[in-house]
C-alpha cells in the first residue's frame, strides 16, 4: 500500500538562500537562530535549555541545516544515528509567500510576479476599496496599511467594534487581509466580504485574501479565532495533487492546505487548529488512509504564532512538542509509505520586522525504500512533487527532479 504523508512545518527555514540578498534576508536562519537562542539561555519561557529535537535529528534535520549553512546548529552534530534521507531546497518561485512555496512543492513553481500593495500607508487603491465597500454595503473601513495582525487589533479593534467598519491591512506578501469581530460583525459577513474582495482583486494578481476573525471584549483580550479562511488563486497548472486525484487517488487536506490550493486536487478537507489538534487529526487520517493517498498537513502555528510574532521561545517549544510526537507518526508507516517533512519559506523569529525570510527549506524523507543519507541541495521545491509523482507512478511533473 503506497501512501505519502507531508508534514509541512510552515516557515521552518534552514538558512538564507543563495538569492536572499534580493529580499533583504542575508543572514536569516530560522532553525539556526532558534537553536542558538536556546543554547544561550535566551528562550527559557515555557521551556528551558538547549533545543531538543532528537527525532527530527535522526531524520536528518541537523545535517540538512549543516549542508545549507556550512555549520551544525548549536546542540546538533554527527553524534546521531540517521534513519532518514535529508536535503535542503532552494525556492525557484519569485516570492517567499505561502502559495508560492506550497504550489512549488507540489510541482508548480510560480514563475510570474505577484501583485503587491507596496505602500506602507494608504496601501490600497481608492478605486478598489470603493468597489468593495459598495458591493458589501459598507460605509467605510479601517487600517489601509502594512501591519502585524496582532498589533492592528490592539490599535483598531475597539474602533472596529464601535463603528462596524472592517479592518483592511496587508504586508510584504501578496495579500489582502480583513480582520473583523466574529460576534459584532459576524463570521458569515466577514467571509462574504472576503469573497467580494477576492473577485474585485482579479486585475491586481494578488495571491490571497485572508479572513482574520477575532473575538474578545477590548484591547486587553482580543484574540484571533480558529476560523481563519484563505481565498487563494488557483495554481497556474496541475499539481501532483491534481494528478493523483485524476488517477483515482485520495488527497486529504488537514488544516489550511485546501485553501492554499483553492481546493484544486483535494478530495477531503479536515479542519483542525493548533499544533496538538493538527497532529491528532493527521494521525487519525493516516490510520484510516487507504492505498494511493496523500495526507497533507500545514502546521501553521510555527508561522502565525511564533515566526511572525518573533516569539523565539514559543517557536522552540512548538518544535519540541512536534518532535516528541513524531514517534507516533513513524509507528503508523508501512514499508511503502513515504513521509516528507519540509517547509514553504522561512520566518526567522530573531529577524527584523515581522515578515517571512527567504531561506532554504529542509527536505526530510523517510520510508519507501529510501536510504539514510544526504540528498544534497535541491534546485527547486518541485523536487518534492516530482518525487511524489514517482512514488505513485504518475506522469512526471514539468518541474523538479525526483530523489526516489
UniProtKB/Swiss-Prot annotation:
Binding site for Mn(2+) 1: 10, 344-345
Catalyzed chemical reaction(s): 2-deoxy-alpha-D-ribose 1-phosphate = 2-deoxy-D-ribose 5-phosphate; alpha-D-ribose 1-phosphate = D-ribose 5-phosphate
Chain residues that bind Mn(2+) 2: 303, 308, 356
Subcellular location(s) of the protein: Cytoplasm
Alphabetical list of InterPro entries matching this protein: Alkaline_phosphatase_core_sf, DeoB, Metalloenzyme, Phosphopentomutase_DeoB_cap_sf
Cofactor note: Binds 2 manganese ions.
Cofactor(s) the record lists: Mn(2+)
Pathway of action: Carbohydrate degradation; 2-deoxy-D-ribose 1-phosphate degradation; D-glyceraldehyde 3-phosphate and acetaldehyde from 2-deoxy-alpha-D-ribose 1-phosphate: step 1/2
EC number: 5.4.2.7
Name under which the protein is recorded: Phosphopentomutase
SUPFAM superfamilies recorded: Alkaline phosphatase-like, DeoB insert domain-like
Signal peptide positions (record): none
NCBIfam families: deoB, PRK05362.1
Function: Isomerase that catalyzes the conversion of deoxy-ribose 1-phosphate (dRib-1-P) and ribose 1-phosphate (Rib-1-P) to deoxy-ribose 5-phosphate (dRib-5-P) and ribose 5-phosphate (Rib-5-P), respectively.
Gene Ontology molecular function, alphabetical: magnesium ion binding; manganese ion binding; phosphopentomutase activity
Alphabetized UniProt keyword annotations: Cytoplasm, Isomerase, Manganese, Metal-binding
Similarity annotation: Belongs to the phosphopentomutase family.
Organism: Shewanella putrefaciens (strain CN-32 / ATCC BAA-453)
One Gene Ontology CC term in the entry: cytosol
GO biological process: 2-deoxyribose 1-phosphate catabolic process; 5-phosphoribose 1-diphosphate biosynthetic process; metabolic compound salvage; nucleotide metabolic process
Amino acid at each position: 500500500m503506497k501512501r505519502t504523508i507531508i508534514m509541512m512545518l510552515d516557515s521552518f527555514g534552514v538558512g538564507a538562500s543563495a538569492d536572499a540578498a534580493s529580499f533583504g534576508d542575508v543572514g536569516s536562519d530560522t532553525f539556526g537562530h532558534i537553536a542558538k537562542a536556546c543554547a544561550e539561555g535566551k528562550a527559557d519561557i515555557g521551556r528551558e535549555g538547549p533545543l531538543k529535537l532528537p527525532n527530527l535529528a535522526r531524520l536528518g534535520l541537523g545535517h540538512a541545516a549543516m549542508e545549507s549553512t556550512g555549520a551544525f546548529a548549536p546542540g546538533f552534530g554527527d553524534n546521531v544515528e540517521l534513519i532518514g534521507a535529508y536535503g535542503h531546497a532552494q525556492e525557484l518561485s519569485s516570492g517567499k509567500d505561502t502559495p508560492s512555496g506550497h504550489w512549488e512543492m507540489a510541482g508548480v513553481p510560480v514563475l510570474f510576479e505577484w501583485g503587491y500593495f507596496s505602500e506602507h500607508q494608504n496601501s490600497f487603491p481608492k478605486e478598489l476599496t470603493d468597489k468593495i465597500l459598495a458591493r458589501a454595503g459598507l460605509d467605510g473601513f479601517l487600517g489601509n496599511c502594512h501591519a502585524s495582525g496582532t498589533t492592528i487589533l490592539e490599535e483598531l479593534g475597539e474602533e472596529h467594534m464601535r463603528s462596524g467598519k472592517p479592518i483592511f491591512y496587508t504586508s510584504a506578501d501578496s495579500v489582502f487581509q480583513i480582520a473583523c469581530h466574529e460576534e459584532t460583525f459576524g463570521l458569515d459577513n466577514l467571509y462574504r466580504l472576503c469573497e467580494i474582495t477576492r473577485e474585485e482583486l482579479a486585475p491586481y494578481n494578488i495571491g490571497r485574501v485572508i479572513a482574520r476573525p477575532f473575538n474578545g471584549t477590548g484591547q486587553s483580550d482580543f484574540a484571533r479565532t480558529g476560523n481563519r479562511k484563505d481565498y487563494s488563486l488557483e495554481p497556474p497548472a496541475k499539481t501532483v495533487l491534481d494528478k493523483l486525484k485524476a488517477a483515482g487517488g485520495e488527497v486529504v487536506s488537514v488544516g489550511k492546505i485546501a485553501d492554499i490550493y483553492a481546493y484544486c486536487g483535494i478530495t477531503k478537507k479536515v479542519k483542525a487548529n493548533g499544533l496538538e489538534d493538527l497532529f491528532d487529526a493527521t494521525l487519525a487520517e493516516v490510520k484510516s488512509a487507504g492505498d494511493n493517498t496523500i495526507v497533507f498537513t500545514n502546521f501553521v502555528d510555527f508561522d502565525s504564532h511564533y515566526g511572525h510574532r518573533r516569539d523565539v521561545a514559543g517557536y522552540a517549544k512548538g518544535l519540541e512538542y512536534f518532535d516528541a510526537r513524531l514517534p507516533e507518526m513513524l509507528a503508523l508507516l508501512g514499508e511503502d509509505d513515504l513521509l516528507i517533512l519540509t517547509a514553504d519559506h522561512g520566518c526567522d523569529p530573531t529577524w527584523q520586522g515581522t515578515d517571512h525570510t527567504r531561506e532554504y527549506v529542509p527536505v526530510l524523507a523517510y520510508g519507501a525504500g529510501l536510504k539514510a543519507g544526504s540528498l544534497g541541495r535541491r534546485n527547486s521545491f518541485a523536487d518534492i512533487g516530482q518525487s511524489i509523482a514517482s512514488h505513485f507512478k504518475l506522469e512526471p511533473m514539468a518541474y523538479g527532479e525526483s530523489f526516489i
